[in-house]
Structure formats: structure tokens, C-alpha cells
Amino acid sequence: MYQSMNLSVSSNFTHRSLLESRFPIFSTGFRKSVNLKPPRVSSGPESNDSGHETLTDKLIHLLRAVPDWADEIKERGMQQKRSLYTHEKWVEHRSSLRHVRHLLSSFSSRVILSLIPPVFFFTSVAVVIASYNSAVALDWLPGIFPILRSSSLPYQLTAPALALLLVFRTEASYSRYEEGRKAWVGIIAGTNDLARQVICSVDSSGDELIIKDLLLRYIAAFPVALKCHVIYGSDIARDLRNLIEADDLSLILQAKHRPRCVIEFISQSIQLLKLDDAKRDLLESKMLHLHEGIGVCEQLMGIPIPLSYTRLTSRFLVFWHLTLPIILWDECHWIVVPATFISAASLFCIEEVGVLIEEPFPMLALDELCDLVHSNIQEAVKSEKVIRNRIIAKIKLHEFKHSSNGRHRS
């Protein structure tokens, strides 16, 4: 049966030997196209290889269990909502008991939990090296095995380089955090200023009132859309449900760039307002802060610290702690185990903080800032008529107290 099938295939194409002799590049593909043998079902070497791969996968899964658990806790902490500080929180922040509070919360800190894999690994390496050196010193091993020891002079010379590398790495991450914070300060200030200009410039009557209400909703929706754009796992449909209407929300959800779609809603609404050119140009100029905010946020999200710098810091730390027990053996002996533990916990903690704040937006209280913008706009709308009527009443009272010729009435 298989011979007949192979003959039928060969009859429609050039002979295999002739094709391979003239065009060797087609030989592999041709063999694959006419491979009509049924799959093997016997328990031969292939089944042993698959069983070996299964054991390897299980071993890899076992070794990755603790790092995956630590990463899951860290990512869960990144998605927690931050809150703005109040006076009570600042008092607690300055409290003399803060060190005790920070110490007691160590086991729930995602920074410390993320240090478990590297610190445990390097401490285990220190235990292995200390055990080996002790076995050699006690003649438990043949004399050909040397004691792993070295001079501490190379470490004394390279320690300042490692310290500077960690400092510069953390400082670069903090600069990104500070840049993201300033960008959002400008976004919130620009949003509030644009809303204030709309409230003051647009009449609250007729069609203008409808457009004004929609425009203020779009302005309040912009920081929410940008927040969902820069924070992974945000639910923009839930966050915007109470701000804008359902048909507008569906259009925003279909857009590839949702913050710019909200800006387009704002621009079109401004164009529909019956304003003179000066006021319209003023409102358009206020939107420059929103465009700049989008640019800065996308730059921070898409361009990390140069990867060569991050990798250099990581490799330096790894090689440093792999050889640290060898360097300290002559002076510390078994004390190299706690010394390696303390060194790894300290230095990797500094590096971990730099990695966490490199992405600044999960560290900021963006949800509360967006809620603050919404509440500020609502308060400004409610107080607009009250303040306007009060000022008009004061003007009328002032005119009533003065005569037509400018003399004050006694």
C-alpha cells in the first residue's frame, strides 16, 4: 500500500535523485513532503527521551516554584492602589516608632519577599564552599583537592566600583520616577486649568450648556484614560462608566490610542462652541499640557534604563557574591555563611528598589488624582452660579450706595 502511494507521488514530480543532485537545497523539503510512514507507537528510545524531558520539566518547575511565587507577590503588589498622603499619614510617617513598624512588616514586604530566591541561592553557595573547605582542612578529601581561598585585595579595589554602580542605577531609576511624577503634576494641573477656562468662558444656556457638560465630562475622563493606558491591568470600561455616556465609551474602547481619542472628543467639542477666536485659541493652547503628558508617559513606558547598564549591575552582583565566600574564608571561616547572607540581602535589596521604581506609574496614586480632578470639576460647576450671583449682588449693592454723580450717600 505504501509503495503504491510513493509511486503515485513520484510520478508527478522530478525523480528524487535527479532533483537532489541538481538542487541540493530542495532535498530536505522533499523528504518531508513524501514521508508517509505511520507514527511509531513502540516503547523505544523516543519514549525514553520524552520521559527524560518530562523529568527535566518537572525539575525546572520545582526550581522555579519559589522565584515564581516571589514574582507573583511582587506583581500583585505593583497593582495595588496607592493613596495620597494626609496629615495623619505624615504624622505616622515621621513617628519615632516607624522603625519598629517597618521591621514588623518585613515579612509582608514585596521587596524583601522578592529577595528570597537570590539570597537563598548565594547563601547556599556559601554553605557548599564552607563545607568543602572544612572537608579539605580535616583531610576528609584526597590531598589533590585545594582549599578555595584568595586574597581580599581585589575586593577592596572593586568595592567602590560596585557601590557607585548601585548608586547610579538607583539614582537613574529615581530620576525616572521623578520625571513621571512631574508629568502627572502637569497633566492634573493642565486638566484643572482647562476645565476652569471652559466653566468661565462658556455660557450655561441652551445648546451651549449641553456641549459644556459633555466637554467637562471629556476633560475629567482624560486623566483616567491616560492612567489606564500606562498601568497594566486597568479596567478602563469600569473607570469611565460613570464619567461619559455609553456610546462615547464604546467608541473610546474601540480606539487603538484611547487617551488621544478622548482628546479628539475635547477638540471637537471646543470647535462646536460658539466662542470668539481668542477664547477658542486659548482653550486649544491649554491642551498642549495634555499632549506633552502623553508623550512623557509613553517615553517612560517604552524606553527603560539602558539594558546594558541594568545587566552590568546584575552580573557584577552575581559574580561578587559567588566569589565572596572564597575571599572571606581565611578571615571568617564558617562566618562566611551569615556574611554572604547579609551582603546579598543588603545589596540586592538596593538593586531591587531601583528596578521597582524604574516603572514610575504603579508607584503613584493615580486613581486618587483622577478622582480629585473629577471632584474639583464638580465643585467648580456647583459653585459657579453661587459665586457669580454673589459678585453681581455686590456690584449692585455698590451701585446702590453711590449716587449717580459719584457722591456717597450718607
Curated annotation (Swiss-Prot):
GO terms for cellular component: chloride channel complex; chloroplast; chloroplast stromal thylakoid; chloroplast thylakoid membrane; thylakoid membrane. Residues 1-110, 169-315, 358-410 are lumenal, thylakoid. Its main location: plastid. Residues 132-147 are stromal. It is found in: Plastid, Chloroplast thylakoid membrane. The keyword Lipid metabolism does not apply. The chain crosses the membrane at residues 111-131, 148-168, 316-336, 337-357. The keyword Transit peptide applies. GO terms for molecular function: voltage-gated chloride channel activity. It is a multi-pass membrane protein. One of its GO terms (biological process) is thylakoid membrane organization. Disruption phenotype: No visible phenotype except stronger photoinhibition when grown in the field. Slightly reduced proton gradient (delta-pH) but increased electric potential (delta-Psi) across the thylakoid membrane leading to moderately elevated proton motive force (PMF). Transiently decreased non-photochemical quenching (NPQ) during the dark-to-light transition. Slower NPQ induction on transition from low to high light. Wider thylakoid lumen thickness, loosely stacked grana and disorganized stroma thylakoid system. Keywords: Chloride, Chloride channel, Chloroplast, Ion channel, Ion transport, Membrane, Plastid, Thylakoid, Transit peptide, Transmembrane, Transmembrane helix, Transport. More active at positive than at negative voltages. Repressed by the general anion channel inhibitors dithiocyanatostilbene-2,20-disulphonic acid (DIDS) and niflumic acid. Mostly expressed in flowers and leaves and, to a lower extent, in stems and roots. Coiled coil: none annotated. It catalyses: chloride(in) = chloride(out). Belongs to the anion channel-forming bestrophin (TC 1.A.46) family. Voltage-dependent chloride channel subfamily. PANTHER family: UPF0187 PROTEIN YNEE (PTHR33281), VOLTAGE-DEPENDENT CHLORIDE CHANNEL 1, CHLOROPLASTIC (PTHR33281:SF1). Voltage-dependent chloride (Cl) channel critical for proton motive force (PMF) partitioning across the thylakoid membrane by anion influx into the lumen during illumination, thus being required for photoprotection under fluctuating light conditions. Influences thylakoid ultrastructure, including lumen size and organization. This is Voltage-dependent chloride channel 1, chloroplastic. The lineage of its organism: Eukaryota, Viridiplantae, Streptophyta, Embryophyta, Tracheophyta. The gene is VCCN1.
